[in-house]
């Protein structure tokens, strides 16, 4: 049996559960990095990115300029111009900082957040989140195979793996150093 990375929907939920378990077991760092790069391109297109020369971009570049890679993964930093207070990192080394966060923090505090995000890249936390997403999908598919009320609830799949990935929160274990 060869399982590819294409997201396919099989007619029987039990088969889909098997495929998702196999995907979770076979997921590689390289594959997660490719998916992360696609996700970041999408996010960058959906947000106002501070251009070179923007005060936010210059501040972040000044603070992060010496950090070029973590465990061989090239880092790239950008600022999203929004009032939201957030920052995130993805498996491909992309780190995005929101201007609303930058407005509230001094340089040392901001670098503590950036360092924290770099830790997610270093620890390969995204691959664990993706494995959990595939296993959750497998569990929903398995419930769908049962039929009845559980099957009907599972039939909606309670969201896709992409949604889980996009909204994945790192566990407390991943948040501690």
What are these regions (language model features)?
Residues 1-177:
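A Zn2+-metalloprotease active-site environment signal
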